[in-house]
From Swiss-Prot:
Biased composition (Acidic residues): 73-92
Pfam families: Ribosomal_60s
UniProt cross-references to InterPro entries, sorted A to Z: P1/P2_N_sf (IPR038716), Ribosomal_P1/P2 (IPR027534), Ribosomal_P1_arc (IPR022295)
One BP term from GO: translational elongation
Protein family (similarity comment): Belongs to the eukaryotic ribosomal protein P1/P2 family.
Quaternary assembly: Part of the 50S ribosomal subunit. Homodimer, it forms part of the ribosomal stalk which helps the ribosome interact with GTP-bound translation factors. Forms a heptameric uL10/P0(P1)2(P1)2(P1)2 complex, where uL10/P0 forms an elongated spine to which the P1 dimers bind in a sequential fashion.
A GO CC annotation given for this chain: ribonucleoprotein complex
Protein's organism: Methanothermobacter thermautotrophicus (strain ATCC 29096 / DSM 1053 / JCM 10044 / NBRC 100330 / Delta H)
Cross-referenced CDD domains: Ribosomal_L12p
Gene of this entry: rpl12
Protein name: Large ribosomal subunit protein P1
Length: 101
């Protein structure tokens, strides 16, 4: 992801997105630079309108962020149901123990 972030930073500041600039940003951030990944990034971004891609991604991410609280509530409800089931199983096991006790 740091390679993408470097490209986005360069784009936002109006700098040219090329191998040298991406390497400089990554090195300044203290990241290890893999020349092959830098070249692949530059090649992949060659025909991409970064501004359009950022807008499209921001719009697509908004609904996902809104759905996150609902998912958290569902997970919490499932955890409560599991606890109730475990308690019922423990009570049933205790009752069976009385038969042999």
């Amino acid at each position: 992801m740091e390679y993408i972030y470097a490209a986005m930073l360069l784009h936002t500041t109006g700098k040219e997105i090329n191998e040298e600039n991406v390497k400089s940003v990554l090195e300044a951030a203290g990241a290890e630079v893999d020349d092959a990944r830098v070249k692949a990034l530059i090649a992949a971004l060659e025909d991409v309108d970064i501004e359009e891609a950022m807008e499209t991604t921001a719009v697509a991410a908004a609904p996902a962020a809104a759905a996150a609280p609902a998912a958290a509530e569902e997970a919490e409800e499932e955890a409560e149901e599991e606890e109730e089931e475990e308690e019922a199983e423990e009570e049933a096991a205790a009752g069976l123990g009385a038969l042999f006790g």
